[in-house]
């Protein structure tokens, strides 16, 4: 019997015009054009130019698909075979899809075509489990693609259907789709929102402009990928028109450069936009398009209603916070705490008993207005300890008398037992024991009486007798008494505490073997007397022990009894940060709602007794609690918390918390309209803030101004301070003008603010002379070279004696290391040169305050004096000043020298800090002592071991000031008849070049050749380059230490 061949319904199958075409997969394939190219697109012949040839090809295609083999079942073809058999007269934007004549849906059941993770849905009547996502399944009925009936239906739909009449409108609408116009379409990415009719029922719908393409896609049940696939399988006869074909023409190479680059859209699929409002609202915007005729909706939901069933919100609603002393009654707080304690006792968890004890403590504190009485706390501790435990006596330990493990021996008298030969013990009555104790005292046997009383437990008689004896005996009797008690007996704890030591219970409590910790704390709290610090340390030790055992609530109970201050979460050494919560765990487990509420109640109890006694470190947790209230939709309560925190911050005048203040203002700014009063006072666009918020803003502004207006760091460079310099008056305007100084005195006072603090105390007014700016501007931070090139940069002329001071310095130093301060005295001409401390730690030694301008010892002389001190010990009589004021100031100068004894990088060069060497205040610079002038006169061209190895120089006189220079060696080189001067080899300078250097530097016979110019480097010390001090220059006392360190070079 022949197999049944499926026939077309109501139509005859015409013969094929071309018999050479072969069948593939149940229907014939059109023949490919000979010019096939696979480079970018499949090139086909343009069949749209000649309408007649295109009609012939359509007829040929119609007849070719009407032929089917008998006995073969028609199967759908794959994408690759479909490409090979595609009709050559049409361009396709995607490869792998068949001829446009075959892109019609059949009313019969079809298969689902898998495309990625999406499916092209076939007949809508099939269930999802019946639609198998496989092509060619033998259990699914398919319709032949080559059926002639569908081509006839195509003509009828073209003339009678509404889709053909409105094709222009449809393509005009879809071309404005933002998803199709996005750059993702260029890259080949699937675009949602493209619509073509899928079935006959959808073809009869009204115009597409009445509904959006996304809504049409949603109703058809197609996803973005399967919907794009359906475009190539849906009947679209309008695509044969030139306008429509151009809309779907692939982008050519010349069109790519002409396209304008567009930013890719963030979301390709419409979604709901959600935002949280500051007042506890949830704002939702559905993806409706008003351009498509849909209503734009904005949904506002209340977070309080949405989260009504959450446990955290219920817990926060039940709490009567914020706890402000004037706004809430303490009965409500006590009721809340009692309810919490009852809940903890019902839970029967390991820490529930201790947690309930904390809540009961808060009830007691609230009842007593925050006062803690030891007896009341002890009563609270002993509520659950109605049955006192029977503490067992410890086993006998080493006896205090014979150091054995035997118990106290009992004297006995009686007849010997005939069987055992032992004398049975005679049980004495209490009267007999006391009588014997008395008889021993009759004969003066105190020690035997004590032993008898201790053996027979007459501890009262023994302790009284021992108290009248020596302390050692009393301690022995006390130790014997306490050893008879159990270790975990609260009496043992009390007696140990009264003995002046930390009880053992404070270090071992919390164990099951030890027993309950509450009786021990109760006996400590109710018997506080004597050393309060000892009791507090014992309670804190007990809390630390309990915390180590994991009993956090119990340890915090002890900390509260010991009045331990609250700490911070980040400081793990603090004892507690929140009541009942350990800050050693992570923050979310630490800052729980219950812990914050407990701590706030404790703060409220303190404020009942002492108003405005806020906990400073707790305010940040209250702000966190207010933020949680706002998150759960309780905006009004959160705003009240902000007001309470603001009152606490404003009450703390001494402390400032800028970060907390800024975050508090931000949260209050968002929640301020939750207050009905603020909302009523609102006028137009102007918001009237509450008074406490205005005060917070003012305080925050003051803090910011204080931070920005703080004094600059002394290490700052002068270039940073030049811009802020000002001009101030100086008591020496003629000197400033005479020396051509810069008048930027604010720079000088700002740069040396630390030097003013370390200067010598002077009751007179202090005024610093400004420096000349261009003298040192190019040498900031340059290392100090070993060779010293004197440069005169400061001259101070004394009006009375005509003397002047010339200060020399080495190049390459920092700016302020040779800075001099003068303290003028009104009515007399007195100059004081104070040591100024450089930011790097170096200090400049200068002379003391004297009526006349005395000589200031240089670093070279200080080194020589240091070497003398090493040799002579403590005898420095020749160098001590004779004037009392100079002596006092010399001591101060010694302290400063000791502070900077290292002298920076050449600290190894000195044996010990040099003491300031100064002359008497009554001496003139021309009338120096013989002890100072004689060695200098004997060696005019030799320098002592010091920082500067250069010979004495002659500093050029500044205009109007006649000076003479005394070099580091000490000899006078040049002078004038009407003036005298002192040149100080400061050893540290901030000036460069050979500015102010005399020409005699290169002409004197004993001078060294000029050193090479060193830029940015510190040369090593070479003793051979430093001329040594001869033995005759040390006041007839050879400086052996200096000779041993630096031997004299042979001539």
Curated annotation (Swiss-Prot):
Cellular compartments per GO CC: endoplasmic reticulum exit site; endoplasmic reticulum membrane; Golgi membrane
Phosphoserine modified-residue sites: 70, 137, 182, 185, 245, 860, 863, 866, 874-875
Feature: compositional bias, Acidic residues: 921-932
Skewed-composition ranges (Gly residues): 984-993
UniProt feature, compositional bias: Polar residues: 1-23, 64-77, 163-177, 737-754, 1022-1037
Disulfide cysteine pairs (residue numbers): none
Entry keywords, A to Z: Endoplasmic reticulum, ER-Golgi transport, Golgi apparatus, Membrane, Peroxisome biogenesis, Phosphoprotein, Protein transport, Transport
Membrane-related topology note: Peripheral membrane protein
GO biological process, one term: positive regulation of protein exit from endoplasmic reticulum
Record-listed Phosphothreonine modification sites: 850
Compartments, record wording: Endoplasmic reticulum membrane; Golgi apparatus membrane
Tissue: Liver.
Major subcellular site: endoplasmic reticulum
Record region (Disordered): 1-109, 157-203, 703-754, 798-820, 850-1051
Biased composition (Basic and acidic residues): 39-63, 703-715, 877-897
Pfam families reported in the protein's UniProt record: Sec16, TPR_Sec16
Membrane among keywords: yes
Ranges of compositional bias, category Low complexity: 798-809, 900-920, 936-947
UniProt region (Central conserved domain (CCD)), positions on chain: 263-708
InterPro entries: Sec16_CCD, Sec16_Sec23-bd
Complex and partners: SEC16A and SEC16B are each present in multiple copies in a heteromeric complex. Interacts with TFG. Interacts with SEC13.
Family that this chain belongs to: Belongs to the SEC16 family.
PANTHER family recorded: PROTEIN TRANSPORT PROTEIN SEC16B, RGPR-RELATED
Function field: Plays a role in the organization of the endoplasmic reticulum exit sites (ERES), also known as transitional endoplasmic reticulum (tER). Required for secretory cargo traffic from the endoplasmic reticulum to the Golgi apparatus. Involved in peroxisome biogenesis. Regulates the transport of peroxisomal biogenesis factors PEX3 and PEX16 from the ER to peroxisomes.
Protein name: Protein transport protein Sec16B
Species, as recorded: Mus musculus
């Amino acid at each position: 019997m022949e197999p049944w061949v499926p026939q077309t319904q109501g139509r005859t199958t015409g013969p094929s015009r071309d018999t050479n075409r072969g069948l593939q997969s149940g229907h014939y394939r059109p023949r490919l054009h000979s010019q096939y190219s696979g480079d970018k697109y499949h090139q086909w012949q343009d069949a749209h130019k000649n309408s007649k040839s295109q009609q012939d090809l359509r007829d040929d295609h119609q007849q070719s698909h009407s032929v089917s083999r008998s006995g073969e079942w028609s199967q759908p073809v794959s994408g690759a075979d479909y490409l090979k058999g595609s009709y050559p007269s049409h361009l396709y934007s995607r490869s792998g899809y068949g001829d446009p004549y075959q892109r019609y849906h059949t009313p019969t059941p079809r298969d689902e075509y898998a495309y990625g993770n999406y499916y092209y849905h076939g007949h809508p009547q099939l269930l999802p489990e019946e639609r198998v996502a496989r092509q060619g399944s033998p259990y699914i009925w398919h319709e032949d693609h080559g059926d002639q009936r569908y081509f006839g239906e195509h003509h009828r739909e073209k003339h009678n259907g509404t889709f053909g009449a409105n094709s222009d409108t449809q393509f005009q609408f879809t071309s404005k789709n933002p998803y199709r116009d996005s750059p993702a379409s260029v890259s080949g990415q699937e675009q949602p929102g493209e619509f073509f009719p899928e079935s006959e029922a959808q073809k009869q719908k009204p115009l597409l402009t009445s509904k959006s393409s996304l809504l049409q896609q949603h109703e058809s049940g197609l996803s973005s990928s399967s919907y794009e696939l359906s475009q190539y399988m849906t009947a679209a006869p309008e695509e044969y028109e030139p306008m429509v074909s151009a809309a779907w023409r692939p982008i050519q190479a010349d069109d790519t450069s002409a396209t304008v680059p567009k930013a890719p859209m963030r979301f390709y699929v419409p979604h709901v936009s959600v935002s949280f409002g500051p007042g506890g609202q949830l704002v939702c915007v559905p993806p409706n398009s008003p351009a498509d005729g849909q209503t734009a909706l904005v949904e506002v939901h209340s977070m309080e209603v949405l989260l009504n069933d959450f446990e955290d919100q219920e817990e926060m609603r039940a709490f009567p916070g914020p706890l402000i002393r004037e706004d809430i009654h303490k009965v409500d707080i006590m009721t809340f705490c009692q309810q919490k304690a009852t809940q903890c006792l019902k839970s029967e968890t390991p820490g529930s008993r201790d947690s309930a004890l904390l809540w009961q403590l808060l009830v007691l504190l609230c009842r007593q207005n925050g006062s803690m009485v030891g007896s009341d706390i002890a009563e609270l501790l002993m509520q659950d300890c109605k049955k006192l435990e029977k503490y067992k006596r410890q086993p006998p330990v080493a006896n205090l008398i014979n150091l054995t493990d035997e118990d106290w021996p009992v004297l006995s008298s009686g007849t010997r037992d005939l069987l055992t030969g032992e004398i049975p013990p005679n049980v004495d009555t209490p009267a007999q024991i006391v009588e014997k104790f008395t008889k021993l005292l009759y004969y003066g046997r105190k020690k035997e009486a004590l032993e008898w009383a201790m053996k027979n437990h007459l501890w009262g008689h023994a302790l009284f007798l021992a108290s009248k004896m020596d302390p050692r005996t009393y301690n022995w009797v006390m130790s014997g008494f306490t050893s008879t008690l159990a270790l975990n007996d609260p009496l043992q704890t009390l007696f140990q505490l009264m003995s002046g030591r930390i009880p053992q219970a404070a270090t071992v409590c919390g164990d099951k073997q030890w027993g309950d910790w509450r009786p021990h704390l109760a006996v400590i709290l109710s018997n506080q007397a004597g050393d309060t610090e000892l009791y507090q340390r014992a309670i804190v030790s007990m809390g630390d022990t309990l915390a180590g055992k994991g009993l956090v609530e119990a340890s915090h109970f002890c900390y509260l009894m010991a009045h331990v201050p609250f700490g911070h979460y980040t400081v793990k050494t603090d004892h507690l940060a929140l009541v009942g919560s350990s800050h050693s765990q992570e923050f979310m487990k630490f800052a729980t709602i219950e812990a914050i509420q407990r701590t706030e109640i404790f703060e409220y109890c303190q404020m009942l007794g002492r108003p405005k006694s806020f906990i400073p470190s707790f305010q940040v947790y209250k702000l966190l609690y207010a933020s949680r209230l706002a998150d759960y939709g309780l905006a009004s309560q959160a705003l009240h918390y902000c007001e309470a925190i603001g009152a606490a911050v404003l009450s703390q005048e001494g402390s400032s918390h800028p970060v907390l203040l800024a975050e508090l203002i931000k949260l209050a700014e968002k929640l301020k309209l939750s207050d009905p009063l603020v909302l009523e006072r609102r006028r137009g666009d102007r918001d009237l803030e509450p008074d406490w918020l205005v005060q917070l803003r003012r305080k925050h502004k003051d803090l910011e101004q204080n931070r920005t207006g703080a004094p600059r760091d002394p290490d700052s460079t002068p270039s940073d301070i030049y811009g802020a310099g000002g001009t101030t008056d100086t008591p020496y305007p003629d000197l400033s003008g005479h020396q051509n100084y810069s008048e930027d005195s604010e720079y000088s006072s700002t740069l040396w603010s630390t030097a003013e603090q370390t200067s010598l105390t002077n009751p007179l007014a202090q005024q610093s002379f400004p420096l000349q700016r261009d003298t040192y501007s190019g040498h900031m931070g340059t290392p100090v070279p070993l060779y010293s090139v004197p440069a005169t940069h400061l001259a101070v002329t004394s009006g009375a004696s005509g003397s002047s001071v010339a200060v020399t310095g080495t190049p390459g130093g920092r700016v302020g290391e040779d800075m001099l301060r003068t303290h003028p005295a009104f009515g007399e001409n007195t100059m004081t040169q104070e040591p100024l401390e450089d930011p790097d730690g170096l200090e400049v030694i200068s002379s003391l305050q004297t009526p006349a301008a005395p000589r200031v010892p240089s670093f070279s002389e200080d080194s020589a004096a240091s070497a003398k001190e090493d040799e002579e010990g403590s005898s420095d009589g020749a160098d001590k000043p004779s004037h009392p004021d100079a002596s006092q100031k010399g001591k101060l100068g010694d302290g400063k020298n000791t502070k900077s004894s290292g002298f920076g990088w050449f600290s190894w060069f000195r044996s010990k800090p040099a003491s300031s060497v100064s002359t008497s205040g009554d001496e003139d610079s021309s009338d120096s002592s013989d002890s100072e002038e004689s060695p200098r006169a004997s060696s005019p061209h030799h320098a002592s071991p010091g920082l500067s190895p250069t010979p004495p120089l002659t500093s050029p006189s500044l205009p109007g000031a006649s000076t003479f220079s005394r070099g580091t060696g000490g000899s006078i080189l040049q002078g004038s008849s009407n003036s005298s001067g002192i040149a100080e080899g400061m050893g540290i300078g901030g000036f460069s070049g050979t500015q102010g250097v005399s020409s005699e530097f290169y002409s004197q016979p004993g001078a060294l050749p000029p050193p090479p110019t060193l830029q940015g480097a510190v040369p090593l010390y070479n003793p051979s380059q430093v001329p040594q001090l001869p033995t005759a220059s040390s006041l007839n006392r050879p400086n052996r230490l200096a000779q041993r360190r630096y031997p004299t070079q042979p001539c």
